[in-house]
Amino acid sequence: MSGKNRLNIFPTRMALTVMKTKLKGAVTGHSLLKKKSDALTIRFRRILANIVENKQLMGTTMRDASFSLAAAKYAAGEFSNSVIENVSNPTIAVKMTTENVAGVHLPTFEKISEGVVSNSQELTGLSKGGQQINKSRESHIKAVEALIALASLQTAFITLDEVIKITNRRVNAIEYVVKPKLENTISYIITELDESEREEFYRLKKVQGKKKKDLKAKEAQKEENSANKTIMEPASVHKVRSLIDDEPEDAELLYED
């Protein structure tokens, strides 16, 4: 097995346990990242559909706003300077919040308040074209609301696109790099441990065979020594008895007269 396709680790049972734990964690992480990617992809497609729909509505809204502005200018003349002079506070405020989707914080923009129109603004165009100016203001308010919604969707779209790419790269890295390396490492450790067990078993068999051989040799030597001792013992006893038997004869000879 090539060392490039596995981790460089010494094959022990502890290392095998560690690799199995890492593989289990990698499988769990791959499953969770896959679910996260699927959830983000579903939300991504939904946002994309909303963007397409809002852009179509945006075209209609901006067209109405432009026509209403042209009609107001036709009816009241140039009134932009008068409007700018009468504006002191913004009539629309935008608030940014975050939405958590599968651990990803998506920025969301929303209109939180609409200021009260001042009397000077209401009186703009009172002499002529006042109705057209009010219609133009309402049309532009709708256009701003549509722009806020579209900006929120596009920001979430870009954020999700980046997160989905990163998540998919992690999923592919675990699936095609991390898991195969861990599996190959586990196979390598198991193979080496099996080989070590076979070598140890062979060594033990050789040691056991040598011990049996030595034991048989000792038993054979012991039996040979016992046989030699048995052969030598009768001659010694006979000789001793002969000497004892001769002594009384000598004693009788000494005391006879």
Curated annotation (Swiss-Prot):
It comes from the Eukaryota. The keyword Transmembrane helix does not apply. Residues 216-226 have a biased composition (Basic and acidic residues). GO terms for molecular function: proton-transporting ATPase activity, rotational mechanism. Keywords: Hydrogen ion transport, Ion transport, Transport. GO terms for biological process: vacuolar acidification. Coiled coil: none annotated. One of its GO terms (cellular component) is proton-transporting V-type ATPase complex. Pfam families: ATP-synt_D. Residues 211-233 are annotated as: Disordered. NCBIfam families: V_ATPase_subD (TIGR00309). Subunit of the peripheral V1 complex of vacuolar ATPase. Vacuolar ATPase is responsible for acidifying a variety of intracellular compartments in eukaryotic cells, thus providing most of the energy required for transport processes in the vacuolar system. Belongs to the V-ATPase D subunit family. V-ATPase is a heteromultimeric enzyme composed of a peripheral catalytic V1 complex (components A to H) attached to an integral membrane V0 proton pore complex (components: a, c, c', c'' and d). This is V-type proton ATPase subunit D.
